[in-house]
Amino acid sequence: MKTTATSFVTGERVVVFVVVSRILLSLPLSLISHGFSLFLLSLSAFLVEIRVETSPFLLSHFSSRRGASSGILLGAVTLPSVMISKLVQLSRAISIHEAEQDELAHVTMQYWAASASCCAILIYLSVIMSQVRKDESLSSSSIWLTRVSLTGTVLYGVACFVSLSMISHTGLNTSLKMLWMLFHGLAAVKLIRHLLCTFPSCASIGEALLVTSGLVLYFGDFLACTIAKIFEKLIPVDLVSISYGIKRTETGIIVQGLLLGLLLFPMVFRFVLHIYESSLRKRDARQRNCSDAAKSVLFFVSLLFFMVVAVPSWMQFVHDFNQHPFLWVLTFVFSEPLKRLSLCIYWILLIVVSVSRFYNISRSSKVERILLRKYYHLMAVLMFLPALVLQPKFLDLAFGAALAVFVALEIIRIWRIQPLGEPLHQFMNAFTDHRDSEHLIVSHFSLLLGCALPIWMSSGFNDRALSPFAGILSLGIGDTMASMVGHKYGVLRWSKTGKKTVEGTAAGITSMMAVCFVLVPILASMGYILSQGWWSLLVAVTATGMLEAYTAQLDNAFIPLVFYSLLCL
């Protein structure tokens, strides 16, 4: 029995428990119902994770990433924790009249949407596991875990209904919001099944859960914004104003349009390719597929039309641009040409020199790949830290453009679109690690997103000056120093099977605190609001460092979000 109880307590779970407890203890009375729902979600995710890891054959038809734990608990609580921390921050803003109720209500809806996605996936996993009860190898305790986890997720749904009814004006309003949450849940279940089947062995269940909930939330916001524009006279005014009535910046609309447009493009191209091949078969029954050259031409023409005509049309529709969005981007860049063009030139030179240098090292040297990849983390610090201090609005747009380029290149690589597909595949393989696969290379995406998301989420009111730096500090400084020091000087390991060392973790935590000590007076001199205590910062940095030490999940994705959520408190 002791062995079983000990196996339930892992380093990653303890850190997640500390993070969730820190968030719950920071909640004002107005967010108690949200905190109760987060507690229920955490409990259900914990039980589902135990159930999966004690009987891994239950989800054997999902080919998750090898060598990683399921990560269900961490994956389920990360995005809701970020949203509830943002609610805590907005509650402080409203108390000093620095934010409006509409913004708080908008983030509240986003919290429940993200939570509903995670809750639905947990219910889906519980249902799958409960269907394997006929197997004689299942113990009574395993069945009990399944029942309790399913009960917890149902109670979570009840808490969601009660909370939404309290902030709604009418029963119809509550019903519409519950339907909206149900839509997010169903979409999340459908999407996670698609991701795990289409990209086998590319992600753990927890990583897939985080990606799924994030994509569903982003697409849901896109869809609601569009529907509100089309049916603003038909949809009740209170629903539109509460859910999606906040002011949207031009940069936010452009980034959202670019990224979602590129994510939707593969479906569009499949449809176009199907029509083209059908027309070929009508002309010649012996010709089944188009040639590679024709496919490449069709791909680039479709991509150009979709991104230059279709996507900007949506941007202009939802935001009323007075010119083409790409022309707006040029106007924005040249509004401060010396600063922004100089920054672009600096980035280009740094990228060219670094990539060519590291690529040659990877081919001719015996430098371990993990250390080589950490050099890119340092490069991210050199690129993004000065820009975030000096040109934060321009950096928002630059992150969106860089991610759009990465998504487009990954689509070309996966489909081997001539003439770039095969060279891209060979080049990318030089920088992959055990978390990448032939199907999908995620390292560059996760690093860029890990740095970008805290910056994007810090737009608007922000009384925690260090929160936009969460990704840069945790990945560029903390994770890099932990890996390099641990690799060269580490002796004491946190676990017998893991590679993370006590020395590396200590170096990561110390380096992050040191950079914070340097950043704080610089930000204060530039007029940033500084209201975070040093003890709170120490807790956030320490918890982040311990999560990096214990987690087997994709740290580039989880660590910045956890650090950001703790910094917002």
From Swiss-Prot:
Disruption phenotype: Pollen tube (PT) overgrowth inside the female gametophyte (FG) without PT rupture. Degenerated pollen grains before maturation, during the early tricellular stage. It is found in: Endoplasmic reticulum membrane. It is a multi-pass membrane protein. Disulfide bonds: none annotated. Its main location: endoplasmic reticulum. Residues 1-22, 89-108, 169-178, 229-252, 318-340, 391-393, 462-464, 530-548 are cytoplasmic. The chain crosses the membrane at residues 23-43, 68-88, 109-129, 148-168, 179-199, 208-228, 253-273, 297-317, 341-361, 370-390, 394-414, 441-461, 465-485, 509-529, 549-569. It is an enzyme of class 2 (transferase). Essential for pollen development. Involved in protein N-glycosylation in the endoplasmic reticulum (ER), especially in the female gametophyte. Mediates pollen tube (PT) reception in synergids through protein glycosylation. Residues 44-67, 130-147, 200-207, 274-296, 362-369, 415-440, 486-508 are lumenal. Keywords: Endoplasmic reticulum, Glycoprotein, Kinase, Membrane, Transferase, Transmembrane, Transmembrane helix. Glycans are attached at N289. This is Dolichol kinase EVAN.
